[in-house]
Amino acid sequence: MWLGVVTLFPEMFRAVTDFGVTGRAVNKGLLELQTWNPRDFTHDKHKTVDDRPYGGGPGMLMMVQPLRDAIHAAKAAAGDSAKVIYLSPQGRKLTQQGVEELAKSDSLILVCGRYEGVDERIIQTEVDEEWSIGDYVLSGGELPAMTLIDSVSRLVPGVLGKQASAEQDSFSDGLLDCPHYTRPETLDGLDVPAVLLSGNHEHIRRWRLQQSLGRTLLRRPELLENLALTDEQTKLLAQFVDSTNECG
């Protein structure tokens, strides 16, 4: 997968290219990331990239010409098929379903805003989609872009050691993930659930599914509203509710 990023702070993306899962993906050639800095497209000695907004008000906007030229350079490198995404709190909220949609693309260009944002006409003429990682304000689009890159890259074939790792992640099937345990068997008086030590793979599968359903019900019940549960899931969830009521 090819990813282009338009950003005033390309150094921040070393966190993506040099570390962790995404860093290994880059080293394996499964993920390619290039950056374009609007400062490199300025025409004055001060490399100015901000400008005053029409109508006044606090703050500045990203200057149109350097930003637009940087986007055009990224498009030229990516080819016609690349989708241009602007990271914005006004965009569609990023969910696992959205991540799966974006992961089907061969190439993406991510535009990271700064200051008070960008000229609306840039969005109208250069951007295909706006995406948000949540209802809160950040200083720029770089952290949302890195979040999107990390989540999308996990679905690129070969990036994770086992595809099952991605399939078991929270939200991959619309549910939160189940609890996980490793050694020791007892920690501060808390034991690993016996079923996980049983070696019975079917029992373990059902326990994990039930825990996933129950955790979703307790912590993010709205997620269940959008799911058509199977007969097995409905039964397991009912059993979870019954056991929770008995305990408490």
Swiss-Prot record:
Keywords: Cytoplasm, Methyltransferase, S-adenosyl-L-methionine, Transferase, tRNA processing. It is found in: Cytoplasm. GO terms for cellular component: cytosol. It catalyses: guanosine(37) in tRNA + S-adenosyl-L-methionine = N(1)-methylguanosine(37) in tRNA + S-adenosyl-L-homocysteine + H(+). GO terms for molecular function: tRNA (guanine(37)-N1)-methyltransferase activity. Belongs to the RNA methyltransferase TrmD family. Its EC number is 2.1.1.228. It comes from Shewanella woodyi (strain ATCC 51908 / MS32). The gene is trmD. Specifically methylates guanosine-37 in various tRNAs. SUPFAM superfamilies: alpha/beta knot. HAMAP family: TrmD (MF_00605). Homodimer. The keyword NADP does not apply. It is an enzyme of class 2 (transferase). One of its GO terms (biological process) is tRNA N1-guanine methylation. This is tRNA (guanine-N(1)-)-methyltransferase. S-adenosyl-L-methionine binds at residues 113, 133-138.
